Amino acid sequence: MKLAIAMSLFFIANAFVNINICGSGIYLPYYMGVLGCIKKNYPISNYSITGISGGALCSLLYTQEKDLSNHDKLWDMTIGKNISVISLHTNIKKVREQIEYNLKLRYSGIKNKISENISIISTNVGNFYEIKSETISSFDNINDLIDFSLCSSYIPYISGSNFSKYYKDGNYIDGQVTYENIELSDVNTLYLHKGMWNRDFSNMNNLLLSKSESQKLFEYGWNDTNKKNIKIFK
C-alpha cells in the first residue's frame, strides 16, 4: 500500500491520478496537511477526487481552493475564528452549522466552477431495509456540493437532531457506514487515510480537538508527505 502511494506521487506531474479520501474523524487536519503539501509541491492537473465522510470536505476544499498551505486560514474559513475546540459531545452540531454557513458565505457571489472530477459518497437510508452507498458526481452549484458533503459526514443524532440529513428527496448519513475500504495497488491512485504514512496516533483523543492540536496534525500530514517524496526524488 505505502509503495503504491509513493509511486503514484512520483508520476503525479504527468499522469492521471485518482485521489480517494476516506473517513477522517478527528484526523481531518492530517489529511489536509497531506493534500496541502501535494497541492503546493506536486500540483496535479489531471485527476479525479472522491471524498467519503470527513474526506468529502477535504475533496471540496481541494477543488475550490488554490492554496491549502495555511492551517489557521483553513480553520478560520471553515470552522470559524470564534471556535477553538471541537468536541464530539458538546459542540459538533454548532461546528457543522458554522462550516456550512462559512463555506456558503465564502463562495457566494463567486463563480466557483464545480469540478467535473469530484465525487462524494454518502449512505442513503431512505429505505431502512436497503441501506446503500450512493455516489454523486454532478452538482447544481457550490451550495449543492456543500450540502451533500455534509450529508457524507453526518453521524445520526450527533451531527444533528435527527437520524439523517435530508438532501433532494433523500435521507443520508455518514458515507463510511456502507463503504468498504479496498486495498489499492494502482500506482496512479492516492488513497488517503490516517495510516498511509505509518504514523502512530495512539495518544490522540478521538473525541476532542483543539485548534493547536489540529495545527500539529496538519504539520504531521505535510511533513510526512514531504519526507516520503524527498526519498523518492533523490
Q: Can you name each region flagged by the protein language model?
A:
Residues 1-15:
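Classical Sec-dependent N-terminal signal peptides that target proteins to the secretory pathway
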Residues 12-50, 60-234:
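Patatin-like phospholipase
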Residues 53:
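Catalytic nucleophile serine of serine hydrolases
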Residues 56:
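Residues forming the Rossmann-fold NAD(P)(H) cofactor-binding site
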